[in-house]
Amino acid sequence: MNPPILAIVMSTVISGTIMVLISSHWLTIWIGFEMNMLAIIPILMKKFNPRAMEASTKYFLTQATASMLLMLGIIINLLLTGQWTVLNMPNPVASNMMTAALAMKLGLSPFHFWVPEVTQGVPMSSGMILLTWQKIAPLSILYQIAPSMNPNLLMAMAIMSVLVGGWGGLNQTQLRKILAYSSIAHMGWMIAVTTYNPTLMLLNLTIYITMTLGTFMLFMLNSSTTTLSLSHTWNKLPLIASLILMTMLSLGGLPPLSGFIPKWMIIHELTKNDMAIMATFMAMTALLNLYFYMRLTYATALTMFPSTNIMKMKWQFESTKNTTLLPPLIMISTMLLPLTPMVLTLF
């Protein structure tokens, strides 16, 4: 894609998300979602091939259906209240419709089927945007309408998302699909705490985006797309192999890494609100995610691909890829746990 066209498309994606974030009027929020959706399609089709075209079509159809459902909920709310404001949501039918539409945009279960397929069909950089930036706008609306949402509906979607995200990733060998199922599971954790403490959902989103960005950048730096390709990493780039190991364990929520903070806080919040059984169930299902992350760390750091090369390290050219953002992302992804009290004061 030409740099000027890419700049225009990216600025439209960012503008659409910002419009959703700063608006309190349902019509401008809907327009922001549409701008974002239409501008992301060329980014998904950056490498023009049948797989990218199929993935983009699936994404467009899913998001268009979600937008239609969202507009239907907005119109029902408008007819009943006569207002366009976001915070005025007294009708449960409109609220449930909007929740379902936003769940479809986020890829929450049972509307999750498009997430692995679309992520696998697009380039790694497009998948990174899809699983990070594209989550911000729908979650910001969920944050605003949290008091008027049905907590039972949200909890059911959270349970299904955590289960699907854990089970779905167990038999995968493609890294993009693994990260897609990981995204579904993380969204489930965020939704579980939305009605009790929406601010904690923002903390979880911030840490999730940081960890996922770092992971995608490491995979792109290493040109890895499958579990098998990770086994070449230790021969070529031992430092990158160590960093992949750390970020994978952090995504799995293993202490003392940063990924443990949101899980710890969410379990504490659920227990505080007499949801101890739910907290126990979610903690147990998190082990499914941890298992496939452990598989990836084993493939990266504890295996070496058979080679006839007698040298310990393979000779290679110095990487020309830009890694400016990588060090701060890795530090935040792995070393935030001691700063938990300070982080909590920010949210």
Curated annotation (Swiss-Prot):
Keywords assigned by UniProt, alphabetized: Electron transport, Membrane, Mitochondrion, Mitochondrion inner membrane, NAD, Respiratory chain, Translocase, Transmembrane, Transmembrane helix, Transport, Ubiquinone
Record flagged with keyword Nucleotidyltransferase: no
Top-level taxonomic group: Eukaryota
Disulfide bonds: none
Subcellular location: Mitochondrion inner membrane
The reaction(s) this protein catalyses: a ubiquinone + NADH + 5 H(+)(in) = a ubiquinol + NAD(+) + 4 H(+)(out)
EC number: 7.1.1.2
UniProt membrane topology term: Multi-pass membrane protein
GO biological process, one term: mitochondrial electron transport, NADH to ubiquinone
Any GO CC annotation of this UniProt entry: mitochondrial inner membrane
A GO MF label: NADH dehydrogenase (ubiquinone) activity
Transmembrane regions listed in the UniProt entry: 5-22, 26-45, 60-80, 150-170, 178-198, 200-220, 237-257, 274-294, 327-347
Pfam short name (any one): Proton_antipo_M
Record flagged with keyword NAD: yes
Top EC group: translocase
Principal location: mitochondrion
Family recorded in the similarity comment: Belongs to the complex I subunit 2 family.
Its job: Core subunit of the mitochondrial membrane respiratory chain NADH dehydrogenase (Complex I) which catalyzes electron transfer from NADH through the respiratory chain, using ubiquinone as an electron acceptor. Essential for the catalytic activity and assembly of complex I.
Subunit (UniProt): Core subunit of respiratory chain NADH dehydrogenase (Complex I) which is composed of 45 different subunits. Interacts with TMEM242.
Designated name of the protein: NADH-ubiquinone oxidoreductase chain 2
Species whose genome carries this gene: Martes zibellina (Sable)
